[in-house]
């Protein structure tokens, strides 16, 4: 990422009401409850920006966080951007829709998957929300991608999993040099000068993600 602007992380934000516990400065054991409107971020979407920001700092890059709900196309046209999260981030869905690997779901939004345009109708990388909620143990899938987005003429980086644990695993993959070296077994030698999209899979056990594995790669 060579642009001079701070690199934006576009991350999903959720508005809602919550109860906040406030403690007395003179007596921290004394507390009161306050109901307030909050903007919250999914905890699974937090670790990737933290890890990637560490890499950016090594290369002397600055960054900023943009809430998905208020991010505009004008802002994204200023330079490369990083998009965190899938079904809670409309920009991720919008930018990945034309790609070979993209996110999809059934009308009831109970099943979510990554679809391959080369094999339409095949739902190999699918997650059933019912299974996820009942057991906490399931296979999860994610997309990691880097490409020139035609809407902005800038590089877009996607770090997005279907459900809890997926986005975190994608972020782990992106900052792990050993895992990035695995890409060389799946791509041509000049892949670093091309657009690339990777499908990852990870085993979730009791809500915790295992190591990410490469399921498919597309370079163009």
Task: Show where each model-derived region lies.
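Solvent-exposed alpha-helical segments and adjacent loops
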Residues: 1-220
């Amino acid at each position: 990422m060579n642009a001079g602007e701070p690199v934006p992380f576009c991350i999903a934000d959720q508005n809602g009401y919550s109860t906040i516990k406030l403690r007395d400065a003179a007596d921290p054991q004394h507390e009161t409850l306050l109901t307030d409107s909050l903007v919250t971020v999914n905890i699974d979407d937090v670790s990737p920006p933290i890890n990637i920001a560490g890499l950016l700092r090594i290369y002397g890059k600055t960054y900023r966080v943009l809430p998905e709900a208020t991010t505009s196309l004008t802002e994204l046209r200023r330079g490369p951007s990083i998009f965190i999260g899938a079904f809670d981030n409309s920009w991720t869905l919008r930018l990945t829709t034309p790609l070979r690997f993209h996110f999809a779901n059934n009308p009831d939004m109970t099943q979510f998957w990554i679809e391959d345009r080369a094999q339409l109708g095949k739902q190999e990388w699918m997650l059933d929300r019912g299974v996820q909620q009942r057991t906490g143990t399931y296979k999860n899938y994610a997309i990691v991608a880097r490409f020139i987005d035609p809407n902005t003429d800038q590089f877009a980086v996607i770090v997005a999993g279907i459900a809890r644990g997926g986005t975190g695993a994608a972020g782990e993959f992106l900052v792990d040099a050993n895992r990035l070296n695995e890409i060389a077994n799946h791509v041509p030698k000049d892949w670093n000068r091309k657009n690339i999209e990777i499908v990852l899979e990870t085993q979730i056990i009791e809500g915790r993600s295992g190591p990410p594995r490469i399921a498919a790669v597309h370079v163009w």
